[in-house]
Structure formats: C-alpha cells, structure tokens
C-alpha cells in the first residue's frame, strides 16, 4: 500500500554477503589465525600448513555435518597427514591440534556466514597465508584464477564427453580450475551412472594437474577431495572412509628447481 505522502513502501530484508565481502573476511581471518599460529611455532612454513590443515578440517566437518568435537581431532590428523611434511609424526600433529583447535570456531563462523562462497576457499586462503609467510620464494609469482575466468574456460566442455576425454591443468595452483570441471562433469554424468562414488572416481581418472610448489600441489589435492565430498554429500552421508576413496591426479616435481615443465629432464611424483 502506498503511503499518503507519496513515499514508496518497502520491505527491509537482510542482504546476502557478496563475494568481495567473503574474500575480505577470509583475508582477515587468515591474518589473525596465521599470526597466532606462527607466534607460537615461529616457523612460517609449518605455520602456513597447520593453518591450511585446520581450515580444511573445518570444511570437512561442515560437509559431514558432524557436531562431535571428539572426532574433529581425528579428521585433523587425517587431513594434516596429506598437507604437513612427512617428518611430522602423529604425535606432533596431535600437539598442533591441541594448541590451535580453538581457531576452528572462528573458521566455523566464517563458513556459516559465507556459506555461498565455501568453494575454493582453501586455495584462496593458501594464497593469502603464503604472502604472509614469505617462505617459499614462489609467492610473488603465484596467480590464482578468478571464478569468472574459470567459467569462461569451462563453458566449452561438451555436454557429451567420452571415456577418453582428459582435462589437464599444467599449472594447477590450488586446483580451482579442476574443481570446477569436477563439478560440471558430475552434474552431466551422475544420472547416467546412478552411483556417485563411481561417478567421481571416473571423473578423477580424467583430471590431471601439475604444480611447481609442492605445498600448493598438496592443497590442490585436498581441495579436490573436499569438492568431491561436497558433491557426494548431496546424495548421501559422507565420512572419513569416503575421504580415503579418492586420490586426485595431482603431480609436483621430485626436486623443484623453478623450471617445472620447462625443465628438459624432470621427474614427478603424485601427491599422496
């Protein structure tokens, strides 16, 4: 009903957060968390990957929709084994959880507030924390593909793909491009196979990525596994068992030398 004085009556609604707001909040969250972690560990490289492990743990538990804090430590141990250097035995990784698990509540609040922008936050968070740690020598040259670029590149994927189709990202970064292809192909193929796990495994067999930075290659692998669980969670309950089913084809150089694919004679290993 129009008010008598000619004003237009409006209904006030709470605005949804924008992608820019989500990115800004993620930067702030990353800075605060990294400073707390590195303030205690005084090791930029380890602090960076502990931060990523904590964030990945939070994302996994959100996908799993499990409120049990008793199992979060087990999830952290599982995920951190793929992100932290192999010399960090379970006892060391468990001590990291005991020291910094309080940060998870901040991550949970972020995911709840910006639920529409959870995809790929792991790789973006790595980019932000990498610039803070300044330990790899690669942070000044890393460029992460924006979503609009990925959408432009992937819109040409045919609706009917063959079993022999292969998708390669030779500089895969945090795996955002491959993650979007995984999502797109899952939508196309799931109804045909009617088996979500088999569908995801078949798609992973067609996705390949190489990354010069071994830490970022590990992030890409974890990022893809989280995306796989997000898709799986749409049709069934997920668990740590499902996590162990998937092994993305992400590779990095055995002995990184800065040349990557430009090196005439280089060998790679698959991220575990």
Task: Outline where the language-model segments fall.
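Non-catalytic, mostly N-terminal accessory regions of nucleic-acid modification and defense proteins
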Residues: 1-143, 232-236, 240-242
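SAM-dependent methyltransferase catalytic region
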Residues: 104, 112-113, 117, 123, ...
């Amino acid at each position: 009903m129009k008010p008598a004085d000619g004003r237009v009556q409006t209904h006030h609604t709470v605005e949804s957060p924008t992608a820019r707001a989500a990115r800004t909040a993620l930067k702030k969250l990353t800075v605060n968390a990294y400073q707390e972690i590195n303030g205690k560990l005084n090791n930029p490289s380890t602090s960076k990957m502990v931060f990523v492990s904590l964030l990945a743990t939070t994302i996994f538990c959100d996908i799993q929709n499990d409120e049990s804090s008793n199992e979060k430590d087990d999830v952290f141990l599982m995920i951190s084994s793929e992100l932290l250097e192999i010399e960090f035995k379970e006892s060391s990784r468990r001590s990291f959880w005991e020291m910094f698990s309080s940060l998870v509540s901040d991550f949970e609040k972020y995911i709840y507030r910006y639920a529409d922008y959870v995809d790929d936050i792991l790789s973006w968070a790595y980019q932000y924390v990498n610039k803070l740690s300044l330990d790899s020598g690669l942070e000044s040259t890393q460029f992460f593909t924006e979503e609009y670029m990925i959408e432009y590149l992937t819109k040409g994927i045919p609706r009917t793909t063959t079993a022999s189709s292969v998708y390669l990202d030779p500089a895969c970064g945090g795996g955002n491009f491959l993650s979007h292809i995984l999502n797109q192909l899952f939508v196309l193929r799931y109804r045909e196979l009617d088996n979500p796990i088999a569908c995801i495994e078949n798609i992973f067999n067609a996705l390949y990525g190489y990354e010069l930075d071994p830490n970022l290659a590990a992030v890409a692998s974890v990022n893809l596994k989280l995306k796989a669980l997000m898709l799986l969670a749409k049709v069934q309950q997920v668990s740590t068992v499902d996590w162990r089913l998937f092994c993305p084809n992400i590779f990095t150089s055995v002995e990184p030398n800065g040349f990557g694919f430009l090196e005439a004679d280089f060998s790679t290993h698959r991220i575990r």
